[in-house]
Amino acid sequence: MKHEPIRPVQEFIGSLADLGTLLPLTVGLIACNGVRPGPALVLLGITYILTGTYYRLPVPVQPLKAMATIAIATGASVGEIRAGALWMSGLMIALAVSGLAQKLNAVFPRVLIRGLQLGIGLMMIRAGAKLALAWGDSLGTVVIGAHGVSATPGSLGLAPSGAEFWRALPLLVIPQLPLTVGNAVLATRDCALSYFGPAGERVTPRRLAATIGLANLAAGLTGGVPVCHGAGGMTAHYSLGARTGLACAMIGSALLVTGIAAGGSMASALAAMPAWVLGVLLAYVGVRHAALARDAFGNATDASTVLLVGVVGLTSGNLMAALGIGLALRLMLRIPAARGVKQRFVDRSR
């Protein structure tokens, strides 16, 4: 990409492009799970600013979609969410240090990632529909009735309990890991090279894994929102005019100021908000996320795998089980194909 003059107006417009994903999931975690709004927004803002400063490109900062969706749908505790962030931090830093992100992606082929994306989207739509149907109720009333938890901020302790730490691994982390490696690391790297040419070479898989790991370490310790980068977010920023890290600094500053100025009163305001408002927002994000799987439906085998993983994830609420079933199906489909290739080789050798 040629060096272009910085256009602040375009950068500002581009900085807002990914709020349609960031805000509904962040608000959902605050309102439905008790994540503290002040620290969450402040940390999101700081992370965005540091990300833009480091990469000098509009690299997005987004909530971990699988983790956030499962947490909202199941009423996961603040401790479990923080434990999930700490798990992701350790895993991503390990991938950055070892350089194994590319190899791990081979374990989770794109078709399985598409199936998980479909399942997450359907779970978002279902969670949004439940909230939207509570037309006359406040969000606080619905959350307490559904999960038995108070829609007030959680504590600011330094660590989750041991039980929460181990529950978070199968519930929140394992379903999230292949999405993070496939989309937040490898696909984001591809987008950076496609959109920004030589300038995008700074956005390497190892660096992306490292910044995701460090951001989630901070989130786990302070009670913030677990985050990642993402190809979709980068495309959104780029499509509306963002070309430099200035866009990240702009949206990050807005989140930082909002967290400092209004964080203390935000939880009460959200609890009083009509439940259907968040329901519609979550359903909208769910539709967009499920639509990511559409490119897998040109092939019958891939389509069946995507549908199986997505439906199992929706009906069971267990994306880890859906991932395991999808892996087993791919293995069963691969064995007959391998036998057919071997038989054709034997026939030709005679």
What are these regions (language model features)?
Residues 20-26, 60-68, 185-187, 224-233, ...:
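Transmembrane helix boundary and interhelical junction motifs in multipass membrane proteins
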Residues 13-76:
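Transmembrane helix-boundary motif of multi-pass solute transporters/channels
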